[in-house]
């Protein structure tokens, strides 16, 4: 008998299909300003390759590009299309270092390991910039991210972190900001201090992702879109099954992040999908624009549910805020994002949103990426916890290095202990929502 297609009910309980139509980009400012790019066919047959990559986000695209550069035959499968997921929907911040602050890494892993992790984080940001330059990707790549704090305790902690990076890691491009300095950059009384990091950067993430895809394709990578992987038969050579085709591969890279679903239970124990939301305002006049941001930088603040924002090239505010923890996005995305935005910028009360969209990322318990070799022929990288532009791009290169026998950085990243999330199956999301609600309540109360 032939293999049955997934039922409509099953598809609706899959984050790949819960909030979006097959193969269509979301109603985002990024999609509205996307560069001309290639489209790819659906897998319709059985093929063989050296490496099969599942997922066309930053991890998968970077791995494909670096493997192809080394002469490796690569097939990349995406359930929708390259750049469709979190890689094409996020805040576009290319953060410096790891998601976790260096002081905590030093305590948890020791100074030597912390330095190795710091260097990988540095290399990640540099990698993004080098790929943009090497492949002439037009994606508005610009320097500067501000970390903005609400409380004196947070400012004190940020001063400590900044001093540590300056003194012990030679980071001369990060500077502390006092209340006057930060309010001369950000037009909000909410923030009373923080730091600015000129080694960090921001970009148009969808155009970056599609630039990677086009470059990989030109180097010989076979990319297939609308090719949902529903099964992996593991062995000396894995067989990756889609509805209409199969791929036989010496190696497989699972690069699905928040859209993993039930494809691999070992990975799903380590990472949890959460939904995040962004809005793009109407075009702002010069006066209103300057009342928000006086520099062309990106901002991420100290809330547990982070607010992040920057100006677009056509003078809109791109503001991210709000999270959810189930399969479906909130019905009113505009209200979800407008609430935190007006707390920061009450002067935008009358400003309209032209675009609102959501996406799904993946977090780990420790907020560090989860890189693993699941068996001799299968790799995984996911759980970037909000720092995926740089680290997912780097993870793809690191997986490539290990496949080619250069395992130093993979050994460092895969040695990070990633605990399982509590609960099993249907209990996991409610438990996460309960924990996250506690932290959101702390945000509301100002802790």
Report the location of each language-model feature.
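Active-site substrate-recognition segment that forms the wall
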Residues: 126, 134-142, 229-230, 246-286, ...
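C-terminal catalytic lobe of FAD-dependent flavoproteins
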Residues: 327-329, 334-444
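Hydrophobic anchor at the start of a short beta-strand
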Residues: 72-74, 174, 351
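Flavin (FAD/FMN) cofactor-binding and adjacent substrate-gating region
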Residues: 11-33, 100-106, 129-144, 149-211
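Conserved FAD-binding subdomain of flavin-dependent enzymes
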Residues: 66, 82-140, 156-168, 290, ...
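N-terminal Rossmann-like FAD-binding beta1-loop-alpha1 element of flavoenzymes
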Residues: 47-76
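Helical element adjacent to the flavin cofactor pocket in flavoenzyme catalytic cores
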Residues: 163-164, 189-250
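Extreme N-terminal leader/targeting segments of oxidoreductases
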Residues: 4-51, 69
């Amino acid at each position: 008998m032939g293999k049955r297609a997934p039922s409509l009910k099953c598809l609706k309980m899959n984050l790949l299909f819960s909030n979006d139509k097959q193969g269509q980009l979301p109603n985002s400012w990024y999609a509205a300003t996307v560069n001309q790019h290639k489209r790819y066919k659906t897998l319709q047959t059985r093929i063989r390759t050296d490496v099969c990559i599942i997922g066309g986000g930053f991890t998968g695209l970077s791995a494909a590009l670096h493997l192809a550069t080394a002469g490796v035959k690569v097939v990349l499968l995406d359930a929708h299309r390259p750049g469709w997921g979190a890689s094409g929907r996020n805040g576009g911040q290319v953060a410096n270092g790891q998601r976790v602050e260096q002081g905590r890494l030093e305590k948890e892993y020791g100074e030597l390991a912390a330095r190795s992790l710091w260097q990988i984080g540095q290399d990640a940001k540099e990698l993004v910039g080098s790929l943009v330059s090497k492949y002439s990707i037009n994606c508005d790549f610009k320097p500067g991210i501000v970390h903005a704090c609400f409380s004196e305790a947070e400012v004190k902690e940020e001063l400590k972190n900044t001093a540590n990076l300056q003194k012990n890691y030679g980071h001369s491009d990060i500077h502390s900001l006092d209340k006057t300095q930060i309010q001369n950059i950000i037009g909000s009384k909410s923030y009373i201090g923080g730091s600015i990091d000129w080694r960090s950067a921001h970009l148009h993430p969808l155009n970056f992702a599609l630039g990677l895809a086009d470059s990989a394709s030109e180097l010989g990578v076979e990319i297939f879109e609308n090719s949902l992987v529903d099964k992996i038969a593991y062995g000396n050579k894995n067989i990756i099954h889609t509805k209409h085709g199969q791929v036989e591969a010496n190696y497989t890279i699972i690069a699905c992040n928040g859209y993993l679903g039930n494809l691999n239970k070992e990975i799903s124990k380590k990472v949890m999908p959460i939904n995040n939301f962004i809005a793009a305002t109407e075009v702002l006049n010069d006066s209103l624009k300057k009342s928000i941001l006086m520099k062309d930088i990106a901002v991420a603040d100290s809330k547990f549910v982070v607010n992040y924002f920057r100006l677009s090239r056509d003078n809109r505010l791109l503001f991210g805020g709000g999270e959810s923890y189930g399969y479906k996005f909130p019905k009113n995305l505009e209200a979800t994002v407008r609430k935190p935005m007006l707390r920061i910028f009450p002067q935008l009360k009358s400003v309209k949103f032209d675009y609102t969209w959501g996406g799904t990322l993946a977090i780990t318990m420790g907020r560090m990426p989860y890189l693993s070799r699941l068996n001799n022929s299968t790799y995984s990288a996911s759980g970037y916890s909000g720092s995926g532009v740089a680290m997912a791009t780097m993870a793809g290169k690191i997986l490539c290095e290990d496949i080619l026998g250069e395992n130093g950085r993979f050994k460092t990243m895969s040695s990070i202990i990633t605990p399982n999330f509590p609960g099993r199956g249907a209990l996991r999301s409610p438990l996460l929502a309960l924990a996250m609600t506690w932290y959101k309540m702390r945000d509301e109360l100002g802790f």
